[in-house]
Amino acid sequence: MCIRDRGYGEDEYCEAAREKIKTACQAPEADVHFLVGGTQTNTTVIAAILRPWQGVISAVSGHINCHEAGAIESTGHKVITLPTTNGKITAQQVQDYVEWHRNDESTEHIVQPGMVYISHPTEGGTLYTKAELTALYDTCRRYGLPLFIDGARLGYGLMAEESDMTLPEIARLCDVFYIGGTKVGALFGEAVVIMNENLKKDFRFIMKQRGGRMAKGRLLGVQ
């Protein structure tokens, strides 16, 4: 059967999927976009947020630092790593780093932190608690740093017995996150959920630039 519909993610299947995701997140105000895989999603979101002189704060064990073949650095952005023993970074670590950067006499010669990246679960399988994520997001907001949650395996994190967070709570405790499909049973596809109004404008342009707008985008929507 031949189906005639709009391309590039503007079809009825993608629109229906967007509405289902907004409902599940209890976030009717969210913008939802579909990309193919995790590395493409991470590079696209990070490129959309950072200015040319900025970098992204991550745990030293973070996925973007260890397992994406330098994808972020290849776009000209530094991954600013913080030490960790359990895969997580803390609100205090972010505060300490930003304060150090702002107060260093050579601050304008050092890559400026422009956002914070975490994954849930972390690269080692640990989970952020609601209290930890709340504290981290409060600190990010205080310093004007968008918080991005890599949710490639978010489904596993939310369903883990020790998890104390829901999908709507995740949505309220970050600026942008994605719901992974590829790593949790879908053929392919990740759903980017943008909560911060300031990050919504022109996102589809950066998607196109990064090769993320599929002509047959409905294949993502049906996942």
What residue ranges belong to the model's regions?
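Conserved PLP-enzyme active-site core in the AAT-like
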Residues: 4-222
